[in-house]
């Protein structure tokens, strides 16, 4: 090829495209939407739930009698106070109708809310029977580092279908 062929080729190309208008830009460039506060909180809850709760961990919990557990280093009097109903729960979580994965997220969110609101005691209603949640909730609670103790709730807070949970909220004085 020589320069004359290039000039002829360019001239023919120019003649062919003469009168053609360029296409107007019709593509929109969308920004990725910013995450809402709810989405961020949900992601954070999932992260907390996944890091604290394992479905395979089997703690040593009582088989007979009321469901109860006390963390090491916590006075046994606290468990007695929970049993008698001396602690009034400030927050209540009803897990009826929840799937296991949803219940795990809600439980993590409840514990986080208790710490945030400086609420030392909460009530978790898992329901009657021998269902999955009734078995899993105590196992999850044992694994969370902020849970100091839990006991089957007194009748006024749900009895066999609920647990009163004592949360470690830091160095705040105990509030009953």
Curated annotation (Swiss-Prot):
Keyword Translocase: no
The keyword Nuclease belongs to this UniProt entry's keyword annotation: yes
One record GO biological process: rescue of stalled ribosome
GO molecular-function terms, A-Z: RNA endonuclease activity; rRNA binding
SMART domains hit by this protein: SMR
Enzyme class: hydrolase
Span of domain Smr: 93-168
One Pfam family recorded for the sequence: Smr
Keywords: Endonuclease, Hydrolase, Nuclease, RNA-binding, rRNA-binding
Entry EC no(s): 3.1.-.-
Subunit structure: Associates with collided ribosomes, but not with correctly translating polysomes.
Function: Acts as a ribosome collision sensor. Detects stalled/collided disomes (pairs of ribosomes where the leading ribosome is stalled and a second ribosome has collided with it) and endonucleolytically cleaves mRNA at the 5' boundary of the stalled ribosome. Stalled/collided disomes form a new interface (primarily via the 30S subunits) that binds SmrB. Cleaved mRNA becomes available for tmRNA ligation, leading to ribosomal subunit dissociation and rescue of stalled ribosomes.
Family statement drawn from the similarity comment of this UniProt entry: Belongs to the SmrB family.
Name this protein carries in UniProt: Ribosome rescue factor SmrB
Natural source organism: Shewanella sp. (strain ANA-3)
């Amino acid at each position: 090829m020589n320069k004359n062929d290039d000039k002829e080729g360019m001239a023919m190309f120019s003649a062919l495209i003469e009168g053609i208008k360029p296409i107007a830009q019709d593509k929109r460039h969308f920004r990725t939407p910013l995450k809402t506060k709810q989405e961020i909180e949900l992601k954070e809850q999932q992260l907390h739930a996944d890091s604290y709760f394992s479905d395979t961990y089997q703690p040593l919990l009582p088989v007979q009698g009321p469901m109860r557990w006390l963390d090491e280093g916590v006075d046994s009097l606290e468990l007695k106070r929970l049993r008698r109903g001396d602690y009034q729960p400030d927050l209540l979580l009803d897990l009826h109708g929840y799937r296991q994965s949803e219940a795990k997220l809600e439980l993590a969110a409840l514990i986080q809310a208790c710490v945030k609101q400086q609420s030392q005691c909460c009530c978790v209603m898992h329901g009657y029977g021998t269902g999955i949640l009734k078995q899993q909730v105590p196992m999850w609670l044992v694994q969370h580092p902020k849970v100091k103790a839990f006991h089957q709730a007194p009748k006024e807070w749900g009895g066999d279908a609920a647990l009163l949970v004592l949360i470690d909220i830091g160095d705040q004085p105990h509030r009953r």
